[in-house]
């Protein structure tokens, strides 16, 4: 249970750190931010209070997904209706500066008062953003057992598609849900990317059964898979071997910025559903269990650091718990009591059949 609570807390911590860094954009490069952090005593002396280090909609939407997953729904359609209701409800109350425009646009298409079509939104050419990926880790926590894979695929795709109806967007939610389930299962980190890519065809099969106009999707499936294939080849973990991930000899903040931009589709790392989870995964591989190193790689860079931080923080919590994390980062964290409650409930319900 502690690791489930840690996952919810550290997802929010990663979001607050990354979002706060992006908001202080006078220091757009990770190197400069890390220098500033060093002058202030670093992460050990930092206290994340709601006034100075608020969370963004990444955390609010993740909490909304988790909140829906712990309700007493009868069937998955009822779960989706509950997600829609919560997404629309929270975004109406969220200050504009803390909401991602793509997520706001996606939510505007939802119809909470339409019983049959509540979560059915049209294909969206602009729906490829990171917002689907950052709200779905809890889906993998709820359905982490290998025998629940089919449910995980369906729920993560639908959860992502509600707001980001574009394969690059909702395959991001499949990706983060799968990674969370692998963390709980204790799967070797280097294996996650391969196993995720092998699961993408299940999502495609599900979409073929449930979407009338699949033609709009077809060309975009390849992009997500090709980007991940390229990444796994670059890190030399595409094959089923015991190899550790291979990093360049020089991989400091400046080099990482270049690499993250290369992986992106628009020159800003972590903006899309393929590269937000990719940067988080790369940071986990490179951090080797060090929270400080994870922050350097996932929370403090010149891209969408709130998104990559939220994903990386949550997965770190599932892998390692809170022991390596300075207490000041979560002691006064915004929504911390509710995050703990959600983690406890997800843990309890994940062993029950539904």
Swiss-Prot record:
**Where in the cell?**
Cytoplasm, Myofibril, Sarcomere
Q: Which domain of life is it from?
A: Eukaryota
Q: Which residues carry this modification: Phosphoserine?
A: 27
Q: Which SUPFAM superfamilies does its entry note?
A: ADP-ribosylglycohydrolase
A cellular-component GO term for this protein: sarcomere
Which GO MF terms are attached to this record?
ADP-ribosylarginine hydrolase activity; magnesium ion binding
Provide the GO biological process annotations.
Answer: cardiac chamber ballooning; cardiac myofibril assembly; protein de-ADP-ribosylation
Give UniProt keywords alphabetically: Cytoplasm, Phosphoprotein
The main location is cytoplasm
Q: Which family does it belong to?
A: Belongs to the ADP-ribosylglycohydrolase family.
Biological role: Required for myofibril assembly and outgrowth of the cardiac chambers in the developing heart. Appears to be catalytically inactive, showing no activity against O-acetyl-ADP-ribose.
Q: What is this protein called?
A: Inactive ADP-ribosyltransferase ARH2
Q: Which gene encodes it?
A: ADPRHL1
């Amino acid at each position: 249970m502690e690791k489930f609570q840690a996952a919810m807390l550290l997802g929010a911590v990663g979001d607050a750190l990354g979002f706060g860094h992006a908001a202080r954009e006078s220091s757009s490069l990770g190197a400069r931010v890390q220098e500033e952090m060093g002058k202030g005593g670093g992460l050990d002396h930092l206290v994340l209070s709601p006034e100075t280090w608020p969370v963004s909609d990444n955390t609010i939407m993740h909490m909304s997904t988790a909140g829906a997953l712990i309700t007493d729904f009868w069937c998955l359609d009822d779960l989706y209706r509950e997600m829609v209701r919560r997404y629309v409800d929270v975004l109406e109350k969220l200050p504009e500066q803390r909401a991602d425009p793509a997520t706001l646009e996606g939510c505007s298409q939802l119809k909470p008062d339409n019983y049959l079509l509540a979560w059915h939104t049209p294909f969206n050419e602009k729906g490829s953003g990171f917002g689907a990926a950052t709200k779905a880790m809890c889906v993998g926590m709820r359905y982490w057992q290998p025998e629940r894979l089919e449910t995980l695929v369906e729920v993560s795709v639908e959860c992502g598609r509600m707001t980001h109806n574009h394969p690059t967007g909702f395959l991001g939610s499949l990706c983060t849900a799968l990674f969370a389930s692998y963390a709980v299962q204790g799967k070797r980190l280097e294996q996650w990317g391969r196993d995720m890519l092998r699961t993408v065809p299940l999502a495609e099969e599900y979409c073929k059964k449930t979407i009338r106009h699949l033609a709009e999707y077809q060309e975009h499936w390849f992009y997500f898979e090709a980007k991940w294939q390229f990444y796994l080849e670059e890190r030399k973990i595409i094959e089923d071997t015991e190899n550790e991930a291979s990093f360049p000899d020089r991989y400091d903040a400046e080099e990482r910025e270049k690499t993250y931009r290369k992986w992106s589709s628009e020159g800003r790392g972590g903006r899309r559903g393929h590269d937000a989870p990719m940067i988080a995964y790369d940071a986990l591989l490179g951090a080797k269990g060090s929270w400080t190193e994870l922050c350097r790689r996932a929370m403090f860079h010149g891209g969408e650091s709130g998104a990559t931080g939220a994903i990386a923080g949550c997965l770190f919590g599932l892998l390692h718990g809170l022991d390596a994390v300075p207490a000041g980062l979560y002691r006064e964290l915004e929504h911390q009591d509710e995050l703990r409650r959600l983690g406890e409930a997800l843990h309890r319900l994940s062993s029950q059949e539904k």
